[in-house]
Amino acid sequence: MGTPLGEFSKAAADVIAGAAPSVVGVGPAGSGVVIGDGLVVTNAHNLRGEIAVTFEDGRVATGMVAGADLDGDLAVLSVDTSGSPALAWSSGEVALGEVVIGLSRPGGGSLRAGVGFVTGLGIAFRGPGGRTVTGALEHSAPLARGSSGGPVVDSEGRLVGVNTHRSGEGFYLALPVGADLKARVDALGRGESPRRVRLGVALAPPKVARKLRHAVGLPERDGLLVHAVEESGPADRAGIRRGDLIVSVGGQPVTTVEELATGLSAAGDAGNADLVVVRGVDELAIAVNFEQTAPSGQASA
């Protein structure tokens, strides 16, 4: 009869061996994962020059970008995946403390694996395009350089996240699997580039907003203070003014730029969003119609 540690070790090794054929190297210093016939998911920041995709058996094929979301750091490659099975997606959400395994094949080298725990959920970070990406999964699985784009799997070997980069605290951040990621991957696989919506305002930090309202004798209120409005932009056309305090988007309270970005991103497909602003002491409901800008992936203010 084996020890609990021995049984855990064997189980982890079995999961790694089962997922290994789906893990690929991308370019000179990245990784990816096969998610369908002819499709590989990786990070957008791995797309440099000609994209060589290296498989478990050593075969190298040239990948073509089906779709890329620079702001969201996600890309789908079209490549011959013959002989490499697609990794199954998890159908549930991971929990804090759950055991996960990070896998990679940095730059087409040997398979690398690390076992760790989910250490954080809903983490925000700056994407390669400089915009905020929200909702990341943080885990403690130790990974080598070049692991970005590789999969994070659960104890059943199912995909629960796509590694994107190391956090400043030594942990790794991953884009979590869920309905939103699946929809984004499907769209990118079809060659549909995401588009970002622009509100067209400059915002003061929440602390500044509270101090300014207090200074002019207005009651303190959580929200984002508009200190400049772009002429003829969506906010200007909707009637938002300098000094307005944005307190909700789509019925959800906003107290940070990240929450505003999330709300605007959710409204992107519809092309409009309902905002509530406080002007002085009055609450105003304002409907904003967005102008669509160049392909991107996250909302901007």
Residues covered by each model-derived region:
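C-terminal cap/linker of serine protease catalytic domains
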Residues: 1-16, 102, 155, 159-221, ...
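Active-site region of chymotrypsin-like
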Residues: 20-22, 75, 79-88, 112-184, ...
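Short, small/polar residue-rich loop motifs at catalytic or cofactor-binding pockets
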Residues: 27-29, 144-148, 223, 232-233, ...
